[in-house]
Amino acid sequence: MVLVIRPKGGIGNRLRVVTSYYLKYIKNKDEKLIVIWRWDKFCNGYFQEYFEPIPNVEFRTHNDPTLKINYSGCSRVGPVDFSIIKPLPHIMNKINEKRNLLNNDYIAIHARRTDHISPAEKRGVFTTDEDFFKFIDENINNSSLYVATDNADTYTIFQERYKDKMKFPYHKDTGSYRKTSLEDAIIDIYMCGYAKKFKHSGWSTFSGLINNLRKNLL
């Protein structure tokens, strides 16, 4: 059997779809999964440029008209396990370099902003700057702080408050809808994943991805 899916949305949504379909239909079975991974404003890069191949999974940038797409969207079909996703060596080297610069002694937050604020507020799960300040002040001690965010102004707020704890400048703005590059986003995921402690943003699949990874990384 060949199953064809087209995950949509940002990197968190897409990896959620891929891993759930892989676990339910492909892993430990003689089946094949074809993933149509399109570049768009929500995800500005291709899976195969950043991650190791997954057994029995083929990633394509465009669909073959002769193939029927079995699913297109951002919903999972069962449990997810992001530990099956492995960054390519040159990406992993950058992650480890940053970890080493922090002596692998840091806490992290993911402050999701931009288009996320209104939906999270409507659901009553928006994580405010004050929520993050409280987490940081209670846990920072002598550790460094790593801030993952999709908004430069938000980064500056934390940088001004914790200037002695933050060692890295903000990512270069891509000037597009997705303000950070996919590589930067992937580095953020794993930096947060390896942190001693982590505070997530409510209603964020990106934060959910990190929390899932932390179960296997720590």
Model-predicted regions and their roles:
Residues 25-28, 162, 214:
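Active-site catalytic pocket residues across diverse enzymes, especially alpha/beta-hydrolases
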Residues 4, 38-142:
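Secretory-pathway luminal glycosyltransferase catalytic domains
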Residues 110-116, 140-179:
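Catalytic donor nucleotide-activated moiety binding site of glycosyltransferases and closely related
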Residues 1-37:
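N-terminal pre-catalytic "stem/leader" segment of glycosyltransferase-like enzymes
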Residues 13, 41-46, 116-119, 153-157, ...:
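Short catalytic/ligand-binding loop motif for oxyanion handling, primarily in non-cytosolic enzymes
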Residues 5-7, 36-38, 110-111, 147-151, ...:
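Short His-Asn-centered micro-motif
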Residues 9, 15, 19-23, 185-218:
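A donor-sugar binding/catalytic signature common to diverse glycosyltransferases
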Residues 5-13, 124, 146, 179, ...:
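Conserved aromatic-histidine-acidic binding/catalytic patches
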